[in-house]
């Protein structure tokens, strides 16, 4: 039991300012508008930042138009979007903080092993936010909720890159 108490304190420390229920609802609602556009989301990231595409061995050096409609691209896009969907679905509930922390920490560890830099995480964030701004109802409240969510996510993931 002591272990879980210590783990909970570590999670709260790492995610010092978890999303409120209202912020989580805003993020979930906006994500629900695009989460089935997996291929378009990943294509937007690759189009904006070809250096990210180059980190994927199965897509490196290939023309985006030639891979966008392939099963491999759709499968990988679905994996990425599903990760976000899982984290978002757990957000806004204090009882889920340790699960969110574990998922996001593993994301950082896995990407460190692949040589992904903090700058590339930042590029992905920029491309994702640009996609969201263009495809969901976007206002100051949505921007603030997403920034809070991504700040928390990146604080944990980037700690694993150190």
Swiss-Prot record:
UniProt-annotated binding residues for heme b: 76, 111
Keyword Cell cycle in annotation: no
Keywords for the protein's UniProt record, in alphabetical order: Heme, Iron, Metal-binding, Oxygen transport, Signal, Transport
Ranges of residues in domain Globin: 18-162
Entries under SUPFAM superfamilies matching the protein: Globin-like (SSF46458)
One GO CC term on file: hemoglobin complex
Subunit and partners: Homodimer.
Record-given protein name: Globin CTT-VIIB-7
Organism from which the protein derives: Chironomus thummi thummi (Midge)
Gene that produces this protein: CTT-7B7
């Amino acid at each position: 039991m002591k272990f879980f108490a210590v783990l909970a304190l570590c999670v709260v420390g790492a995610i010092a300012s978890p999303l409120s229920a209202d912020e989580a609802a805003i993020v979930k609602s906006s994500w629900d508008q695009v989460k089935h556009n997996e291929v378009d989301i990943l294509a937007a990231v690759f189009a904006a930042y070809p250096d990210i595409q180059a980190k994927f061995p199965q897509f490196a050096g290939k023309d985006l138009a030639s891979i966008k409609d392939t099963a491999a691209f759709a499968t990988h896009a679905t994996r990425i979007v599903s990760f976000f969907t899982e984290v978002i679905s757990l957000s806004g509930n204090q009882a889920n903080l340790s699960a969110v922390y574990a998922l996001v920490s593993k994301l950082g560890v896995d990407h460190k092993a692949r040589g992904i830099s903090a700058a590339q995480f930042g590029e992905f964030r920029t491309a994702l936010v640009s996609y969201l701004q263009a495809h969901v109802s976007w206002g100051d409240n949505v921007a603030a909720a997403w920034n809070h969510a991504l700040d928390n996510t990146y604080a944990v993931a980037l700690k694993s890159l150190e």
